[in-house]
Amino acid sequence: MDKSSTMLVHYDKGTPAVANEIKEALEGNDVEAKVDAMKKAIMLLLNGETIPQLFITIIRYVLPSEDHTIQKLLLLYLELIEKTDSKGKVLPEMILICQNLRNNLQHPNEYIRGVTLRFLCRMKETEIVEPLTPSVLQNLEHRHPFVRRNAILAIMSIYKLPQGDQLFVDAPEMIEKVLSTEQDPSAKRNAFLMLFTCAEERAVNYLLSNVDKVSDWNESLQMVVLELIRSVCKTKPAEKGKYIKIIISLLSATSSAVIYECAGTLVSLSSAPTAIRAAANTYCQLLLSQSDNNVKLILLDRLYELKTLHRDIMVELIIDVLRALSSPNLDIRRKTLDISLDLITHHNINEVVQMLKKEVVKTQSGELEKNGEYRQMLIQAIHACAVKFPEVASTVVHLLMDFLGDSNVASALDVVVFVREIIETNPKLRVSIITRLLDTFYQIRAGKVCPCALWIIGEYCLSLSEVESGISTITQCLGELPFYSVSEESEPTETSKKIQPTSSAMVSSRKPVILADGTYATQSAASETTFSSPTVVQGSLTSGNLRALLLTGDFFLGAVVACTLTKLVLRLEEVQSSKTEVNKTVTQALLIMVSMLQLGQSPVSPHPIDNDSYERIVLCIKLLCHRNDEMKKIWLESCRQSFVKMISEKQLREMEELKAKTQTTHAQPDDLIDFFHLKSRKGMSQLELEDQVQDDLKRATGEFTKDENDANKLNRILQLTGFSDPVYAEAYVTVHHYDIALEVTVINRTKETLQNLCLELATMGDLKLVERPQNYSLAPERSMQIKANIKVSSTETGVIFGNIVYETSNVMERNVVVLNDIHIDIMDYISPAVCSEVAFRTMWAEFEWENKVAVNTTIQNEREFLDHIIKSTNMKCLTAPSAIEGECGFLAANLYAKSVFGEDALVNVSIEKQTDGALSGYIRIRSKTQGIALSLGDKITLKQKGSS
């Protein structure tokens, strides 16, 4: 039998106390030394030591002591020691303590009486308790409430013993009388608890006869009342109507704990709209009134559960839920937004967006550290609202565009992605968005935000004025050309006597010029304009945000600038009738592109231009020099069509996910029938009628029946020993979120009784055994079940191994049967999850642990291999289907999952098909902790070869 521990005491194993030292201290007259010795003895007992020689010493020298601390420690000691022999009979020496316990129960000091009564609550031996029953009963009438409340608990514990009802035949009647006369709140609560536990009918009768007074009862008593109601309604569901009235009355209680329990009880007992609405309102009120963040998070979890099961009712309370955003805690705000976004409808969208806009404005105050992160969450929420309900986009897009220059790059990136989607899905807003973007473009200082903003300018500037404004804005943000002077180039290259000539492909003519020191140098025509220093003055329009970024070596941005200018020039050709103006603009664009190439190949630049950016800019130069209709169509139409296709796929994916969620809805074709008219009312309240209707619907739709998958249960059984071993063992493994439960069936296959049989387990990885192994006796050819709990603290592949050790009467030595290892699968702890591309990239950059697994598989199709990896790792593919379809010989995809411990698992699959048809490449796993990266890597290595 597993023993329940009533205390936890720290014990330093490095300094074990010797039994003789303890004995000497106990025999002395020093009270402090006795206290210290008793503590050491208790610690030894708690850690599995048996010190039987101390028992008589304690009876002689400790039992008579009047010191309260010693008496308390004595009771702890008596609780811990073994009181029975191997056959379950009480040891004869235990009778010695009965007289002392009786004396304590009649002691003039109420503390001694109280702690002794509390000790009796934990006594399971009827032979020890029986002689004490008269003294226990006398304490029911003691003047002090501390004694009375513990006397009631002692009677309850004794009454629950196997033969307890014979020791206290009329205990329920006595306690019922006590309950009617008792004035102490705690004693009254204990009395009601005793009736609820031992005589439920009496408790119910007392409750129903005092219905009007329930709301005035003490908080602890009200909590027991709710527990009783839950218990009664499970066994007698037909009677829950009258109890729900009591719960509704308790919703107005002063105690927050009672109100919370009332709401939970209502939800568990009834699915009637009135009951659910009352519970949801209660949670929302508590959410605003409670200051503890942990309490708020628990309440949000309850609201999330209600949203999942009763969305229609929760929709009415969305504004109440959103009020939780007033909390400065980011976790609370994130959960609040997650719940609210699923409750948005056409009726409440305007209110919700208005509230979110107010919150965005509040973040500009800059008082809190994490305002940027909170603003990012709000922007993402508004984005989701605008995608679901395009009509609200016009009310928020201009407000959010003020944050394009936000110092929080992630927040600014979310804004620009939002603007990009809205300008495509809401054509009416195109003109106002472009105008606002061109006006505020100079404020954008983030290298990740500028490319997206430039793409929007290149794609959506359609009229002549817009195209000209777009080109003008880009030119101003680049500043004066070139990006450096020749004198600046010579400074970092003092070791070189000559200035490296610029490639002839980039210049049209050369001529000698006189430098500042009087020497001659060759200069290209591209450098004939006034020289400007690469020093950037922040915040000024003329300094140019694009210029500043280019001078830091961001040539990917340079390639985007070149592409945007190319698109604008091609569109200018269509809307501008004057060829002269077009040619001027082409020349200006070419000058900018050549200057960027010149900067990229100059030692002034901190980083040389990369090949991809170089080729892209050169392509733009060639295109502007040799324009044709086919290229114009590709640049002006095909790029936009690709984006439109991407948005359409995203919307389709979201619709499919929404459909998948709503497939579990319980709406039926006959929902419109008013069942109330078919019921005989019989004085039933509205809530009772609703509840009965809901139960009928559940019964009709089969919601009350739940099938157990026995086949699945059998699959979890692991064989631990061989059939030829003297002891056969198999384990059924149940994996919970934070622990693993092992149910080990042990069969004695011999003709002898196995004594001191013990299941010894050990773990490897982040697994910990919760309890100490117990010894058992197993009869010949009999079986027994041994349970073991193992705590899991992280997502890491763990191993459980061990032995079964036993003794027989014939052999003095212990026999050992080695068990097969039990491997705990990481797949039990991770589940597919979704995150934005920006969030994925941010985490990818931040996470320090990476595990790189080489592709080694017999699968020859790229998509088939990816699907196999997704299935094997239980992850979600974040890459759009359109990006990975087709036969192009290579594939790259991102996968994401989350563990039950909140850990993120990121996987990037990059594969290429070789000429012989085999796949090669790498699967890279990144995570914050080493365990999940290694475990996932091992899993992929194991699974990637096969197709099963």
Curated annotation (Swiss-Prot):
Keyword hit for Metal-binding: no
GO cellular component, one term: Golgi membrane
Subcellular location: Cytoplasm; Golgi apparatus membrane; Cytoplasmic vesicle, COPI-coated vesicle membrane
Any one GO BP annotation for this protein: vesicle-mediated transport
Domain of life: Eukaryota
InterPro entries: ARM-like (IPR011989), ARM-type_fold (IPR016024), Clathrin/coatomer_adapt-like_N (IPR002553), Coatomer_bsu_C (IPR011710), COPB1 (IPR016460), COPB1_appendage_platform_dom (IPR029446)
Keyword Protein transport in annotation: yes
Single GO molecular function: structural molecule activity
HEAT repeat coordinates: 49-87, 92-126, 127-164, 274-311, 312-349, 391-428
Membrane topology: Peripheral membrane protein
Main location class: cytoplasm
UniProtKB keywords: Cytoplasm, Cytoplasmic vesicle, ER-Golgi transport, Golgi apparatus, Membrane, Protein transport, Repeat, Transport
Subunit record text: Oligomeric complex that consists of at least the alpha, beta, beta', gamma, delta, epsilon and zeta subunits.
Function of the molecule: The coatomer is a cytosolic protein complex that binds to dilysine motifs and reversibly associates with Golgi non-clathrin-coated vesicles, which further mediate biosynthetic protein transport from the ER, via the Golgi up to the trans Golgi network. Coatomer complex is required for budding from Golgi membranes, and is essential for the retrograde Golgi-to-ER transport of dilysine-tagged proteins.
Identification of the protein by name: Coatomer subunit beta-1
